[in-house]
A protein has these predicted regions:
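Acidic/histidine-rich, surface-exposed loop or edge segments in extracytoplasmic proteins
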Residues: 39-50, 117, 203, 208-209, ...
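Bacterial N-terminal signal peptides
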Residues: 13-23
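Acidic/histidine-rich catalytic neighborhood of metal-dependent amide-processing enzymes
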Residues: 121-228, 233, 237, 242-245, ...
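Boundary at the C-terminal end of the N-terminal hydrophobic targeting segment
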Residues: 26-28
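Active-site-proximal beta-strand/loop segments in catalytic clefts of secreted hydrolases
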Residues: 44, 76-78, 96-98, 107-111, ...
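Bacterial N-terminal signal peptides that target proteins for export
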Residues: 3-14
Length: 307
């Protein structure tokens, strides 16, 4: 064999090796599609204000219903007793089956505040970003469960809950968390609650300036798993630099004994100046932050499935 022929064969072999390994290498380096989550959020937020009793709220319901029409979708309609009287509300639950016996719930609220109805409050970060996040997570779960397949771990249910926000400007235990209080009670009655291995809440985490607090009431072992997921992706600078107790949609489940965690960035804008104002708009959220969220959520799901 000539010197030229020898090195030609070596080069050919290396080329084949690279072509063979590249798909696996690329797969191992893939990140969550935060751009898709941002686009879903943009479409959803374009509906406008979506407070209870409004036409925008009805449009938000129709948006979710249409998007998930080919999935295992349940609509959980109920009437909430509120300071303005009985109000029709609706949770949306999308189910993706798993091999293991049990359920992981990922949740977000989707409505905006009734008491902000007189301003153009669209809740891009607060309700909009996390609706987009769960929709993009659904894309991945849908691909994994296509053609009758099941997820390797537990079933995953996505909950888009209604009525998280208070009707009145002052938040109280009785005027807030309507959807999750209703759902936790319903699932306690019918035995569903016993199947839930973890409840993971996403709230206000599309913020470009992402700084997720450690919600201090959250279940310790879930916090530890999220830390593990964060460490894997080297996202430490975005997570858990301070502790804070937050009244949020995880509490109705936590109080009934379900391991629960609230993934929240409660400080939004300089001195929290964007929170619950008409400054909560799409220009304040980013695909980068949603990529971080999605990576951590999906890895946390995987880690829970390994317990």
């Amino acid at each position: 064999m000539s010197f030229f022929s020898f090195w030609k064969k070596v080069a050919t072999g290396l080329t084949l090796l690279i072509v063979t390994l590249t798909p696996l290498t690329a797969l191992s380096q893939q990140h969550f599609n935060g751009a898709a989550a941002l686009e879903y959020a943009r479409q959803f937020v374009a509906i406008g204000p979506r407070f209870s009793t409004s036409s925008g709220h009805a449009k938000a319901e129709a948006f979710l219903r249409d998007h998930f029409r080919h999935d295992q979708l349940e609509e959980d309609a109920f009437t909430a007793s509120t300071p303005i009287g009985p109000v029709a509300m609706r949770n949306f639950i999308v189910r993706f089956p798993g091999k293991k016996n049990g359920v992981i719930v990922l949740a977000t609220h989707y409505e905006t505040n009734y008491w902000l109805k007189n301003i153009n409050y669209v809740g891009a970060n607060d309700g909009g970003s996390t609706t987009g996040l769960l929709m993009a997570i659904a894309d991945q779960l849908r691909a994994q469960t296509a053609h009758g397949k099941t997820l390797d771990g537990y079933s995953v249910w996505l909950v888009f809950d209604d009525g998280e926000e208070s009707i009145q400007p002052t938040w109280t235990d009785s005027d807030s968390l309507y959807g999750t209080r209703h759902l936790a009670a319903k699932w306690a009655r019918d035995g569903t609650l016993e199947k839930i291995k973890a409840f993971i809440l996403a709230d206000m985490i599309g913020d470009k300036d992402l700084d997720i607090q450690r919600e201090s009431q959250s279940t310790d072992w879930l916090v530890a798993l999220v830390r593990q997921a964060v460490k894997k992706f080297r996202y430490n600078r975005y997570f858990f630099k301070k502790d804070e107790a937050v009244s949020d949609d995880h509490l109705p489940f936590l109080r009934r004994g379900v391991p629960s965690i609230d993934i929240i960035d409660i400080d939004y804008g300089p001195n929290d100046s964007y929170h619950h104002t008409d400054k909560d708009t799409m220009d304040k959220i980013s695909a980068h932050s949603l990529t971080i969220d999605g990576d951590v959520f999906l890895e946390t799901i995987r880690l829970i499935g390994m317990r």
